[in-house]
A protein has these predicted regions:
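Basic amphipathic alpha-helical segments that dock to polyanions
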Residues: 60, 64-67
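The DNA-recognition helices of helix-turn-helix-type DNA-binding domains
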Residues: 41-42, 55, 67, 80, ...
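Beta-hairpin "wing" of winged helix-turn-helix
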Residues: 68-88
Length: 130
């Protein structure tokens, strides 16, 4: 039976999962680390690179552009010589930081347990799946 309300709504299977788009923002390797480091205020590119261990210049550039495009941070260029570019969380970026802070805290608290579980798993004689 078709109702007027059901005709105006697309079928659930056809709806794109918009939550997945948000998870793409926060689920990559570097985005949350950038957001965490900007939570105390604006930073320049070199300050961010120094603060995030292991990130390449290219990956930091890609991550910053992506977060800027998504409205998580702003990029400000000051017309001085040499040009001064800084990055700062937007109000939406600040709420993302608040929402993800517990995840980063959980990660820090459980990293040793994760390492131990991985070592136990890797030490098993046969870890192949059927």
């Amino acid at each position: 039976m078709t109702t007027p309300d059901s005709e105006s709504r697309p079928a659930r299977q056809q709806e794109p999962c918009r939550t997945r788009e948000v998870l793409d923002i926060v689920g990559d390797k570097w985005s949350l680390l950038v957001v965490r480091n900007l939570s105390q205020g604006p930073l320049r590119f070199t300050e961010l690179k120094r603060a995030i261990d292991g990130i390449s210049q290219r990956m930091l550039t890609v991550t910053l552009r992506s977060l800027e495009r998504d409205g998580i941070l702003t990029r400000t260029v000051r017309n001085v010589m040499p040009p001064h570019v800084s990055y700062e969380l937007t109000p939406m970026g600040k709420t993302l930081r608040q929402a993800t802070a517990p995840l980063l805290e959980w990660s820090t608290a459980h990293l040793a347990h994760i390492d131990a579980a991985r070592a136990t798993y890797d030490a098993r004689p046969d870890t192949s799946l059927p």
